[in-house]
Design a protein with these regions (language model features):
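Well-ordered beta-sheet/strand-loop patches within structured domains
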Residues: 3, 12-33, 38-277
Length: 277
């Protein structure tokens, strides 16, 4: 049978290594951070609760503890100013401005307005960001899907690619005035289009020469909703968070009316003394 010889072992005890509270604090401490909407994804980035503790207090608690006793170090929690729940509850909850206009004209014009409205719909602007109509719904080419329809050029009504899109830019301008947003760039038409209920609320755009731009001067993100319904009525609404209660209501006043005059120009194909029928 196997034989066993006794083994002598010397047992020594030693105090545990003192914890490095500064190192622990550097691992667990966090600054509070507000929730926000990501610029690229347009999704909510959750808020962060601030975490910290007093290293001197932690050392004092440890020094006062008996052997084998479990100690707890109190954490200092700091809530951010804008939590995830608060942002979700306030995001796009208010109508800052809304307006509708009726679209007339041939089917190509309706088609262009509908296409532009679909490209505009769902646009989100963060606080301080500037919106560009041309960058959002352009380019105004056949290759990008637009068709030829009536528009004003050089004082005349002609067919041109993307004709009709100015009704959407005008409708949007009208709504931004209601929402009290900051207008950065806006150009009026040579003639009153007739589709805007208030004279002076139109906004013409074209290629890279004329744009309609405005800035989100609120403290929260804003979102644009736009669509053309089956009755050819164009709807534009801007959603956001109303923190001021200040809104605009554009109107016009007719001060005077200037009668028009006929201007006659000779044309070789028409006999002298006659007018075209």
């Amino acid at each position: 049978p196997a034989s066993y010889a006794p083994i002598e072992a010397q047992v020594t005890t030693a105090p545990p290594a003192a914890p490095d509270f500064d190192a622990i604090r550097s691992e667990v401490a966090a600054e509070p951070a507000d929730a926000y909407l990501d610029k690229e994804t347009r999704e909510i980035v959750p808020s962060v609760t601030g975490v910290d503790f007093d290293t001197a207090q932690a050392q004092a608690v440890l020094d006062a503890a008996g052997e084998g006793e479990t100690v707890s170090v109190p954490l200092l929690l700091t809530e951010p100013k804008l939590t995830t729940a608060k942002l979700e509850a306030n995001l796009f909850k208010d109508v800052l401005g809304s307006g509708s206009t009726t679209c007339a004209g041939p089917s190509n014009r309706w088609y262009n307005i509908d296409l532009a409205a679909k490209r505009l719909n769902g646009t989100i602007l963060l606080p301080g960001e500037t919106f560009s109509y041309n960058d959002t719904v352009g380019p105004y080419t056949l290759a990008s899907g637009y068709k030829a329809a009536g528009t004003y050029q050089n004082g005349q009504s002609v067919d041109a690619t993307a004709g009709g899109i100015c009704q959407l830019s005008s409708n949007l301008y009208w709504v931004t005035l209601k929402a009290n947003l900051e207008i950065v760039e806006r150009h009026k038409h040579q003639f009153n289009g007739g589709y805007m209920p208030v004279i002076g609320t139109d906004a013409t755009v074209w290629s890279d020469q004329l744009d309609f731009r405005f800035q989100n001067n609120t403290d929260y993100p804003i979102k644009i909703e736009s669509y053309l319904d089956k009755n050819h009525k164009l709807h534009v609404t801007i959603y956001g968070t109303d923190t001021t209660g200040i809104h605009g209501e554009p109107y016009h006043v007719v001060i005077s009316t200037v009668p028009y005059k006929n201007t006659y120009q000779p044309k070789d194909s028409i006999p002298v003394g006659t007018e075209p029928q």
